[in-house]
Amino acid sequence: MLGQTGGVTVLATVDLGSSAAIIRRAEERDVPAIVDLLAADQLGATRDGVRTADDLAAYQRAFHAIDADRAHLLVVAEADAEIVATLQLSFLPGLARRGALRAQIEAVRVRGDYRGRGLGEALITWAIHESRRQGCALVQLTSDKSRQAAHRFYERLGFVATHEGMKLAL
């Protein structure tokens, strides 16, 4: 952790050329902006977003569950007093690999006007560093099959497509 800025613990700073961003732990006040990021892509547009007060309440309940559990970190990148990126990092204990602790990166989103400026790479690099710091043996992530550009991005950062994932909606 780098330090405090305005009462917020800064986890990392990112030089964006003409400006800078900080990576910090998400706070409840960030939930609407995070949901906007989730809903702003082709997949999230059909499953995320706040249309009613009940929708917002569901996201707030989820935020509180994540925030209360030390095995989960929800972080945001803030630039020019706006939330411009997010990701969730979860730590998963398991018996496989001699009881190795794994890190799972999920819900990576960077606002469109901040893509291509190094912010996504900085977020992932921070997540890898934090995973090492927590004693993880590996970092894993999933990405929808339709996200070919994201796959190339993750491969460029050293991730290897080793598994075929499956989901069952409940």
Residue ranges and their predicted role:
Residues 64-75, 104:
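A short helix-loop-beta-strand connector motif used in the catalytic cores of GNAT acetyltransferases and
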Residues 22-36:
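A short beta-loop-alpha structural element at the N-terminal edge
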Residues 74-76, 82-91, 109:
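Conserved beta-strand in the GNAT
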Residues 28, 39-62:
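Conserved GNAT-fold acetyl-CoA-binding loop/helix
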Residues 140-150, 167-169:
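Conserved beta-strand-loop-alpha-helix junction that forms the acyl-donor binding cleft
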Residues 124, 131-143:
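Conserved GNAT acetyl-CoA-binding A-motif
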